[in-house]
Amino acid sequence: MRILGIDPGLRVTGFGVIDQSGHTLSYVASGVIKTADADLPSRLGTIFEGISTLIRQHSPDQSAIEKVFVNVNPQSTLLLGQARGAAICGLVAGGVPVAEYTALQLKQAVVGYGRATKEQMQQMVVRLLNLSGVPGTDAADALGMAICHAHGGTTLSTLGGIAPSLAKKGLRVRRGRLVG
């Protein structure tokens, strides 16, 4: 199965394409769609067209995109939501099913910790996909989104939610084992 991950943004939208065969994940492509300093409709059109081009080039079976979070600045949140909407419209117009995950679900599925840093995300993406170089943060987040979906992001996020209850009991997970 081929998965297209999207990290939406009005100026820079990250994308990552991976193949999943059983438990094996393989890197296909990643990068960014950059919008010019133009009016909002033109930028949204660039995102839509960029997604459409990616679908034609890579023929994904599924896609995953980050849910919008509420920013301190409401205007930024609205603009991000519009960029996300343009990307989703491109995916739907291309006939690609869309799954949505929060940043917390993404980080728990890829790093195992919901408050992971951008650098930790990048390093885990490199390890999980056996990359020779470190992708930029937008591309890494998009690849992470695809990995999250491949690993059944919602299930992993739910399992990750068990960790706080274990911590209250003085237990934690270390190297796949419970320690106390």
Curated annotation (Swiss-Prot):
Q: Which Pfam families match?
A: RuvC (PF02075)
Instruction: Look up the record and name the cofactor or cofactors this protein needs.
Output: Mg(2+)
List, alphabetically, the CDD domains matched. Answer: RuvC
- What GO molecular function terms would the record report? crossover junction DNA endonuclease activity; DNA binding; magnesium ion binding
GO terms classed as biological process: DNA recombination; DNA repair
Q: Where is the active site?
A: D7, E66, D138
**Residues that hold Mg(2+) 2 according to the record:** E66
Superkingdom, natural source: Bacteria
Catalysis performed (reactions):
Endonucleolytic cleavage at a junction such as a reciprocal single-stranded crossover between two homologous DNA duplexes (Holliday junction)
- Quick one: which residues bind Mg(2+) 1? D7, D138
Q: Which PROSITE patterns match?
A: RUVC
Q: EC number(s) of the enzyme?
A: 3.1.21.10
Q: Which InterPro entries match?
A: RNaseH-like_sf, RNaseH_sf, X-over_junc_endoDNase_Mg_BS, X-over_junc_endoDNase_RuvC
> Cofactor comment in the record?
Binds 2 Mg(2+) ion per subunit.
NCBIfam families named in the record: ruvC
Give the quaternary structure: Homodimer which binds Holliday junction (HJ) DNA. The HJ becomes 2-fold symmetrical on binding to RuvC with unstacked arms; it has a different conformation from HJ DNA in complex with RuvA. In the full resolvosome a probable DNA-RuvA(4)-RuvB(12)-RuvC(2) complex forms which resolves the HJ.
Which family, according to UniProt?
Answer: Belongs to the RuvC family.
The UniProt function text for this chain reads: The RuvA-RuvB-RuvC complex processes Holliday junction (HJ) DNA during genetic recombination and DNA repair. Endonuclease that resolves HJ intermediates. Cleaves cruciform DNA by making single-stranded nicks across the HJ at symmetrical positions within the homologous arms, yielding a 5'-phosphate and a 3'-hydroxyl group; requires a central core of homology in the junction. The consensus cleavage sequence is 5'-(A/T)TT(C/G)-3'. Cleavage occurs on the 3'-side of the TT dinucleotide at the point of strand exchange.
What is the name of the protein in this document? Crossover junction endodeoxyribonuclease RuvC
Organism the protein comes from: Paraburkholderia xenovorans (strain LB400)
Task: Give the gene that encodes this protein.
Answer: ruvC
